C-alpha cells in the first residue's frame, strides 16, 4: 500500500491531480492569525471526495484518514492547492493520497503544508456500501 508521509521531501513536486484550488481568507484564521488547520483538513476532505466520486462513479463517504502533520502554516492570501491520487482500491473502499500545498501570496513560491491518506467507501442510495466498478477507460473531467 502506498502511504503519504507529510515530512518526506517537503519541497518536492506535488503528486497526483490538482483537484481543489482556493484562497485562504481572513475568516479562516485561528487565534494566532494563521489559517485554521480544520479549514485545511476540510479542503483536503473535499478534494479526496471529488477524486473518490470520480473513481467510484457515484457517492462516497469518508471513513478514516491516517495521521496528519502540519509542517508549515497557511497564511491569509495563500492559494491552497490540493492534489489527489488513488493509491488502493478494494471491493467497496479506496485509499486516496491527498497533499496540500500553499502557493504563497503574490509569489510563485509553493510549499507542501500537509498530507494524509484518506479512506473512502462507495455507498448506494440507501447509504450502504456498494462495490466499486472497474476503473473507467478515461477519467471524466470538466
Task: Describe each model-derived feature in a short phrase.
Residues 3-10, 14-20, 75-76, 87-142:
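HotDog/MaoC-like acyl-thioester-processing domains
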Amino acid at each position: 500500500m502506498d502511504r503519504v508521509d507529510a515530512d518526506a521531501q517537503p519541497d518536492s513536486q506535488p503528486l497526483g491531480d490538482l483537484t481543489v484550488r482556493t484562497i485562504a481568507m481572513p475568516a479562516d484564521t485561528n487565534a494566532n492569525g494563521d489559517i485554521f488547520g480544520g479549514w485545511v483538513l476540510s479542503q483536503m476532505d473535499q478534494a479526496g471526495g471529488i477524486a473518490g466520486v470520480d473513481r467510484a462513479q457515484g457517492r462516497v463517504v469518508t471513513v478514516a484518514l491516517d495521521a496528519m502533520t502540519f509542517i508549515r502554516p497557511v497564511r491569509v492570501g495563500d492559494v491552497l492547492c490540493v492534489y489527489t491520487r488513488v493509491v488502493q482500491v478494494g471491493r467497496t473502499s479506496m485509499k486516496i493520497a491527498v497533499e496540500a500545498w500553499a502557493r504563497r501570496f503574490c509569489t510563485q513560491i509553493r510549499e507542501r503544508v500537509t498530507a494524509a491518506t484518506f479512506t473512502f467507501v462507495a455507498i448506494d442510495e440507501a447509504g450502504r456500501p456498494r462495490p466499486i466498478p472497474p476503473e473507467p477507460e478515461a477519467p471524466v473531467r470538466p
